[in-house]
Every structure is written in structure tokens, then in C-alpha cells.
Amino acid sequence: MSFSVTLPDGSKKDFDKAVSVKELASSIATSLGKAAVGAKINGVMKPLDYIVDEDVEAAIITDKDEEGLDILRATAAFLLEAVAKRKYPELRLGMHEADEGGFFVDTDKEDQIKVTELPDLEKAMQKAIKNGEKIEYTSMKKSELEEIFKDDQFKLDLLKDEEDEVAVYKLGDFVDFGFDALLPNTGKIKNFKLLSVAGAYWLGKSSNPMLQRIFGTAFFKKAALDEDLKRRAEIKERDHRTIGRDLDLFFVDPKVGAGLPYWMPKGATIRRVVERYIVDKEVADGYEHVYTPVLMNVDAYKTSGHWAHYRDDMFPPMDMGDGEMLELRPMNCPSHIQIYKHHIRSYRELPIRIAELGMMHRYEKSGALSGLQRVREMTLNDGHTFVALDQIREEFAKVLKLIMDVYKDFDITDYYFRLSYRDPKNTDKYYANDEMWETSQSMLKAAMDDLGLDYVEAEGEAAFYGPKLDIQTKTALGNDETMSTIQLDFMLPERFGLTYVGQDGEEHRPVMIHRGIVGTMERFIAYLTEIYKGAFPTWLAPVQAEIIPVNEEAHGEYADKVRAELAKRGFRAEVDHRNEKLGYKIRESQTQKVPYTLVLGDEEMNANGVNVRRYGTEEQISKSLDDFIAEIDADVKSYSREK
């Protein structure tokens, strides 16, 4: 026997007998053999015990590599399965996965595993880690595994996709499959944490049983684990779902409709302020705001192409019984096209800018729903401009300037530009007109080049009817998210027969520019909630000033007078008339992250003044009511956090 192993640098090592991955690593360098945790053999992850006995390409994986962390986390998931099965013999195991976020294991138990049981599972894992229990890598016939798991439908489902010979891992009597590479023993899984338990449908289908998904993470170094747990705690504090509950901004009740948020008065106030701001900005920029129905005849979506390309994301149509089929709109563009078509248009009117805070409905699977970020009913800050061909670049620059102005007011600074094209290898899901795609993509690129802006290009991210500029922001939780979009569309004007009368008296086809400045109200307010951590700047805060009388009987009437003065000038203020201790009320105001807390006692009442405490500070300053009104007025008008 003789064979060669090709290494990443192109060099080769020759062998005359079979070697394990660990032996291969040691033959390259003794230190590499000690650091190795696995290898990529012909691009596939393999464990240290894997035997190499033929010509292959090999890359050794160490604990310094990302793939090494995947191997560690997969091993932690395997160990969690083993100890959970020991602790709960009746337990059935489903999917498992390890990635850059950590690992998870799906479990099925009649008496569901609760988060309070995680410490006991951790202790069982730590005991196995301390003992350095051996993890055996071997293979078994698929038929053997089917016999072992004959009473476990979950495992039988997973075995359907396996070959006749299946790689398996054993820890004592425990056996499982579906792992690429694991460590040879439990000793290195020292720095791990079980994080949470959540529901997950088997194979991701809502018609299947709901399992309990246990999440965890693991690192080679304790410092890395500590840093990750600190980051996760920060994320939890910033999670808009948590803040929304604590500040009473919104709620979602699956019993009355998953993905359908209810806006409480405070959340509705924030949304209303944002909506008014957006409308004022757009009107000042030449847009005409409209209202259009949320229902539309299905034929409109057949004409637009949504029915063919977007139907899976739409709710089923409503049969009105007289041949009419109505559809909840998933997008606003066909509605704005009807506004354009309602009159004969002249070149003198162009560009025609139409905008709407348009309510839409999209069918999202229940497993994808999340707070305000993924919902089934949403209100989009939508706009469409109809232009002549020679107006595209100027209008594109104008829209981009409007977006940048809005970003400045909200102090959005962490973003980049992405030009999103169709996938040339998978054109079936896009409007079939190669010339249109080439023209619109080159025009979009030229418009960005004219402005001297840096951008990345992404194939496969375009809408089915045209390429677009996506402005990608980084959320407070570290996720990449599309905030704004500008899109060139030659298709819909063609499909709906849109025209304008040109200077020559002939009919011409306009180009349609789709644009969204801040996306949906739901997602944007989720973004703001997390960025501000619930401590909204004064202009956005649902309650701008909390007024607390020291003694209700003595100072309650004066507190109402102060609130009335503030309300008269357009400021949002509340009086805390509850029969609670003063210190409790002040702490509550801070907990609710109200920008200004005003405490009113004898001194303030006699001087027609207020005692002011800014959120996040201990300092209390007495001043006249007029001076405070001037202060809060300047604060509200400053908009940006930087100002």
C-alpha cells in the first residue's frame, strides 16, 4: 500500500500504510499533532480517529480554527444528548447542530424539559468531562441503526437520508449519528454553558410535533466563554421583545394571532412620532402622500408577477362568491401604479413621487416570527417615483440624499451599500428579460459610481422584477439588516401599460423607482428600541416628563397644572398620582427610562418651578418652569443622539 496526502500549501506526504488523522498531523509537526482536533479530508470534516488509506487532500484543523470550534461545539451537543438520555431514559432525541452561534439539541419528553433543569444537565456534563470519557468513532450499517432506533420515529426519519454505511459515535452505551467530526474524548469541553430552552417543530414544519430545543455554547478558552456570555447578556438587555414588555410598548398574543402585534399607548406614541416625522420629510422632498386599500383583486398581482413569483409569501385569496377574488396585499407598488394610471400623465409632471405608510400582509411561517422584526402584518414606509429615462440618475441621487438626511436625524452611522443583482445561474425566479436586467443593473451601478460611493455587489439578492441598492445596517444585536432600498423597475410599467405624453406628443414608457427609507414601522421601531436600549431620545420618548408630587394632597393640583402647561406646548407628560412612596416613584420613572423626572414639593410649588432629574443621572436641579420648558424644547428639537 502506498498513497499521498496533499497539504494546503501543495506539498505532499507519502505513506506506505494507513494512518489516522492524528498520526497524519503528528507526521507534519509534533506540535500540530498535539493541537489537532480534526481535519478536512477532501473538503469533508473528519475526526482524529478517521483512517486515511488513499490519495487525498487534507487540511489539519486545530483549536485556533473556526472549524475547530465547530468540532468542540458538536462534541458538547453530543455529550448533552448522552447525559440527557442517561438522566431521562424515556427521552427521544431529534436534530442537533453546531455553528458560530453555539449548539442546540432537540428533545422530546412527555414532561417537557424546563430551563430550571439545565443546571442539573450541566453538572452531569461536567462529571463526564472531568472523567475524560472516551468518544468512539466507528461505522454501522444503516439496517443496524434502524433496528436500534426502531421505536424512535425521529431517528428513523433522519436515517432516510443516510447511506448504507453510517458514521456513528459512541459514549458508553449511547450511540448517535449525523455528526461530521467530534473530539476523541470529553476532556476538552471544559468551557461550556447551557443557555436556554425553546420550542421547535420537528423538521421545521408546524404540522409536526413541537420539541424542546436546548441551546448552549462552548469555547476552548474560559476568557472567550466569559466574553460571549457577557455579550449575550447585553443582547438580552437590548432585545426589543424584552424592552417592549418591560416598557409596555407592544405585545403579541398567539391565541389571537401570531405575528400580529398590538401597539400599546406608549408604543403607539413612538410609532406615531416616527410616522409624522417621515411624512413631513417626504412631503418636503416633493412626495404626495396617499391612502390605498389593503385588499386588491388577485388579477392585479397576476399582472404584476407577484402571483407567479411571490405567491408562497402571500395569504390565500378571499373568494367573494361572485367571481371576484380579493388578496391582502404583500406589497404596495400595484396600488401606487393605480394612482399613476388614474390620470393621463405629461412629461411636465415628471418625476411623479407617490408615498404611503402602507399596511401589508405577508405569510410568514410561525417559526420565523419574532417580536416586531418578523410579523405577518406590517406598515411599510413606501414610495414610488415615476421618471423619464434621462431623470433616473438625478432622482436616484435625490432619494439617496433623503435617506442619508434621515439617518443623520436618527444617528444611524453603522451601514454600508449593497448592489443586489439577480442570480445569473438561477434566472427562473426573476422576470425573464435579459436586456432589461443588463440595462437596469448597469444604470444602478453607474448611479453609484457617479456619487463616488463604495459598495459591495451581491448576486441573487434582487427582487424578482429588478435590481436594487440595499443599505445594510448593523443592529444593536450585531445582525446585518436591510434598512433602506432603492430599486429600478422597467418591468411593472411595461406590464401595467404605464405611459406619459412626451414633448413630441407621443406616448412614452416611464421608469419606476421603488424606495423605502426606513423599511417597515415594526422593524424600524424594533431597531430603534435596541439601539437606544429603550432610553429613547426625548423627541421619541413616549413620556417625555414624569411629574411626581411629593405629597398628593399638598402638591397634586400643582402637578396637574405643570402637566397642563407642558401639554399645551406639545410635550408628553404624565403625573404619578399613585399612593406610593416618593423614592419608589422616582425609581419607577428611571426604570421606565423617562428622559425627565420632575419632583414637586413646597419649594417648587411656591416658586412656580420644578426639580429636574435627567434619566441616567443622580443630579437634581431646581429651576423655574419656564426655564425647564426652554430646556426640554431645545432637547426635543435636537433630534440626534449626537446633538
Swiss-Prot record:
Any GO BP annotation: threonyl-tRNA aminoacylation
Q: Name one GO molecular function term.
A: transferase activity
InterPro entries (UniProt xref): aa-tRNA-synt_IIb, aa-tRNA-synth_II, aa-tRNA-synth_II/BPL/LPL, Anticodon-bd, Anticodon-bd_dom_sf, Beta-grasp_dom_sf, TGS, TGS-like
Q: Which UniProt keywords apply?
A: Aminoacyl-tRNA synthetase, ATP-binding, Cytoplasm, Ligase, Metal-binding, Nucleotide-binding, Protein biosynthesis, RNA-binding, tRNA-binding, Zinc
Q: What is its EC number?
A: 6.1.1.3
Family in the record: Belongs to the class-II aminoacyl-tRNA synthetase family.
Name the job this protein performs: Catalyzes the attachment of threonine to tRNA(Thr) in a two-step reaction: L-threonine is first activated by ATP to form Thr-AMP and then transferred to the acceptor end of tRNA(Thr). Also edits incorrectly charged L-seryl-tRNA(Thr).
Q: How does it assemble?
A: Homodimer.
| Protein name per UniProt | Threonine--tRNA ligase
Biological classification of the source: Bacteria, Bacillati, Bacillota, Bacilli, Lactobacillales
User: What's the name of its gene?
Assistant: thrS
